[in-house]
Swiss-Prot record:
Main location per the UniProt record: plastid
Location of the protein in the cell: Plastid, Chloroplast
GO CC annotations, alphabetized: chloroplast; mitochondrial large ribosomal subunit
Annotated region described as Disordered, given as residue ranges: 224-274
SUPFAM superfamilies linked: Nucleic acid-binding proteins, Translation proteins SH3-like domain
Organism phylogeny: Eukaryota, Viridiplantae, Streptophyta, Embryophyta, Tracheophyta
Protein name, as recorded: Large ribosomal subunit protein uL2cz/uL2cy
GO MF annotation list: rRNA binding; structural constituent of ribosome; transferase activity
This protein's record includes keyword Plastid: yes
Amino acid sequence: MAIHLYKTSTPSTRKGAVDRQVKSNPRNNLIYGQHRCGKGRNARGIITAGHRGGGHKRLYRKIDFRRNEKDIYGKIVTIEYDPNRNAYICLIHYGGGEKRYILHPRGALIGDTIVSGTEVPIKMGNALPLTDMPLGTAIHNIEITLGKGGQLARAAGAVAKLIAKEGKSATLKLPSGEVRLIPKNCSATVGQVGNVGVNQKSLGRAGSKCWLGKRPVVRGVVMNPVDHPHGGGEGRAPIGRKKPATPWGYPALGRRSRKRNKYSDNLILRRRSK
């Protein structure tokens, strides 16, 4: 990612950075408007996702997570910014005339060709089933259910590793450190998702974060009782409980929050590292 550092002319630009090489110029037939209502609240106005609100209007880009244009070569035409995710996207022109957006693989350049299918080369950006990949391949945009499209390792810089194949399942090490089983006939894309250094980019000021729809993060004790169990009281008050709690009232320190007897428990060989 080519980072442009602002010249220090004001306090807000002292540590600000932006990527000047990637711009947004979406195609009209691959975008549509979305109604963002609530901004982190449900129908009753209760906060269900904290620290959300405001932000600039967005148009949703239709991303091809299925990669079902089989055995048809496509050419990367543009690399664009997507306001709905922290990874970049690239526009693909396929040989049959189809045009689609996909996640930008790290290192892919304008003019490169990609393809998806069963017997395609192990090349960055190509999509193929796990059965046709050698062990140790770095992959992203991984299917969990055949034909449903990629659901794992889609964030900026995300990459998983194929470490074993046995029977009808393949063993993957996910970006979180979790090791789990995936059906071997599911597809994935070779390589790592681009925009790796996005978590190291400094926005420089609070207003830039507001444009992204992110509100300030504050402690629970300074909230109202309707928003957090620690809230309320006269002036500076203790939490009023024996132990800290989450905004939904569950124990905050150490208790596992994963649902018991979940269907995927048998597929997880090692829990994710915290």
